[in-house]
């Protein structure tokens, strides 16, 4: 992937950029793998906002991605196309399996049209192949990692993300997460070789607020700019500092978002470094 910069023909275009989509080989998705997708605008079933700063955006169709590839062990597949997916930052790859079935996967870096993909413990260690952690050599960079055997890929699915297998210890494999945390995961869990492609996506300059609205992202308003009825930091005569330590709109102190006493904490070997004093 590359990034194409715009010339400053308008204030909104000045400094903005866009992906060049050079790796995309087809513009229309596979119809059998597309589902309708309705928008919630960040509201729950009662109409209350439960996820702020969401709403609007271009209409999308959902592409069904295969995050559980266990049932295709030993069935080779060919990469038919690399496609754009509006629902995620990564590109997706359309696989044609030897038994006639078609499926989408998240496209890893360096995967090309025409490549051969394998699943199962006997698969080669090459980008796009999916196999259990216990069959992957130590030091390998992986993505789309399961947290429970058969539970489907949960970790490292966005553009440019990856996890490194740093050690194996009995029934567990030790993984270095994107946050720097080292965690034990059941060695029977599956992972895909390589890192997720489209890594330069994070370098795109969106240029103007309107492009974020096309993506369905609404403005983020500071608490000190609100009225007292709307936020604990609101109100005051003129500009103020908020008058207290930073809190959420509901009065919860900022930071410390990890739940204490979580059962899976015992699997953490080394915690992520946050840079904050505890």
Curated annotation (Swiss-Prot):
Keywords: Ribonucleoprotein, Ribosomal protein, RNA-binding, rRNA-binding. It comes from the Bacteria. Residues 1-58, 210-278 are annotated as: Disordered. Residues 210-220, 269-278 have a biased composition (Basic residues). Residues 23-33 have a biased composition (Basic and acidic residues). InterPro entries: NA-bd_OB-fold, Rib_uL2_dom2, Ribosomal_uL2, Ribosomal_uL2_bac/org-type, Ribosomal_uL2_C, Ribosomal_uL2_CS, Ribosomal_uL2_dom3, Ribosomal_uL2_RNA-bd_dom. GO terms for cellular component: large ribosomal subunit. Residues 40-49 have a biased composition (Low complexity). One of its GO terms (biological process) is cytoplasmic translation. One of its GO terms (molecular function) is transferase activity. Part of the 50S ribosomal subunit. Forms a bridge to the 30S subunit in the 70S ribosome. Belongs to the universal ribosomal protein uL2 family. One of the primary rRNA binding proteins. Required for association of the 30S and 50S subunits to form the 70S ribosome, for tRNA binding and peptide bond formation. It has been suggested to have peptidyltransferase activity; this is somewhat controversial. Makes several contacts with the 16S rRNA in the 70S ribosome. This is Large ribosomal subunit protein uL2. It comes from Beutenbergia cavernae (strain ATCC BAA-8 / DSM 12333 / CCUG 43141 / JCM 11478 / NBRC 16432 / NCIMB 13614 / HKI 0122). The lineage of its organism: Bacteria, Bacillati, Actinomycetota, Actinomycetes, Micrococcales.
